[in-house]
């Protein structure tokens, strides 16, 4: 029987916390036209300006969360890779990053050299965005074409509303919900509004809607924000959360362009003003803890919340290598993958 490799795909991380490694990583990341969607000359100019100060600032942030084994994102992704192997009897399980190492190109070439002819991609992004899902899949297409690889590739589509994914979220978060708390904030990664407007052509599509319930199927398939809301609503229903005891926000905005709202930093202050003292925060757009969860929320967000008058902010870990998530990912990859 022909082996079918499972290739886990995530965003990536610098090789180390050294400024030069962080600069190289940021340059590769920000020069991706799916991330900064400007014409090349303008993109190069903007990224060059960003790279004057940002590498040192980011290196400091990475240093605050770096583990002895290396980047938390890479370490946790490796743990997931090892944990899923017994659940994937069809072939090897590999890991690749869109930026940094292990590079998609290197991993695909290695699989081809080993005689693998079928690959199932598992982009580890529950919700769809060009800057995550599309760019990863396009890089796979580029490598296959550039090296004329004879690979039959399928890919796991976004799984923001899949029951097994939602059940894994509920199971992983359940112990934290048993702790005394006033509110649960679901903080998703943000996105420039224009990224969504380019895909969703309906001028009536509301990027300030508080619910996904009235979003058309056509818009839902392309709107990252609506998919985040759908995840949050389905999670809240499954977890039995009371209305008013949870809310949604979007973090990590960069630059002056308008990003999807509400912003997490503004939401933290708002919750304090509403009397929330003990806050739980989960980040369902990420399946592995990384700088955006550990440093941006777990450190800076916590400091902001307490400085504003809150008593405590507890960051709930991502799915990482939770057994329920391991089983869910293997199940979805085998059952839902479609031709690339």
Curated annotation (Swiss-Prot):
Fe cation binds at residues 189, 292. One of its GO terms (biological process) is heme biosynthetic process. It catalyses: heme b + 2 H(+) = protoporphyrin IX + Fe(2+). GO terms for cellular component: cytoplasm. Keywords: Cytoplasm, Heme biosynthesis, Iron, Lyase, Metal-binding, Porphyrin biosynthesis. Its EC number is 4.98.1.1. InterPro entries: Ferrochelatase, Ferrochelatase_C, Ferrochelatase_N. Pathway: Porphyrin-containing compound metabolism; protoheme biosynthesis; protoheme from protoporphyrin-IX: step 1/1. It comes from the Bacteria. Its main location: cytoplasm. One of its GO terms (molecular function) is ferrochelatase activity. It is found in: Cytoplasm. Pfam families: Ferrochelatase. Belongs to the ferrochelatase family. Catalyzes the ferrous insertion into protoporphyrin IX. NCBIfam families: hemH. This is Ferrochelatase. The gene is hemH.
